[in-house]
UniProtKB/Swiss-Prot annotation:
It comes from Pseudomonas aeruginosa (strain UCBPP-PA14). It comes from the Bacteria. The keyword Cell inner membrane applies. It is found in: Cell inner membrane. Signal peptide: none annotated. Could be involved in insertion of integral membrane proteins into the membrane. It is a peripheral membrane protein. This is Putative membrane protein insertion efficiency factor. InterPro entries: Membr_insert_effic_factor_YidD (IPR002696). HAMAP family: UPF0161_YidD (MF_00386). It holds the Pfam family YidD. Belongs to the UPF0161 family.
Length: 86
């Protein structure tokens, strides 16, 4: 799934985007943001972050610098190590 999404974004970047020109209000552009989000967070969360970004990319939003959030490791109880004495 991840490779399919990346392939679709790359197709857009090389085949469609040059025809319509730069229109994104953000840096990095929405397609680059989504590509990076999928690489960092995986297909599901990265796709969600990219979709949220696309919904904010409209004429009434000021845009600006909006990097992909860093991955936050959340260990569930099954992966935590017990401290001595517990």
């Amino acid at each position: 799934m991840k490779f399919l999404l990346i392939g679709l974004i790359r197709f857009y970047q090389y085949a469609i985007s040059p025809l319509i020109g730069p229109r994104c209000r953000f840096y990095p552009s929405c397609s680059h943001y989504t590509l990076e989000a999928i690489r960092v967070h995986g297909a599901l969360r990265g796709g969600y972050l990219g979709a949220r970004r696309l919904l904010r990319c409209h004429p009434w939003h000021p845009g600006g610098y909006d990097p992909v959030p860093e991955r936050q490791e959340q260990a569930c109880a099954c992966h935590r190590t017990a401290k001595p004495g517990e």
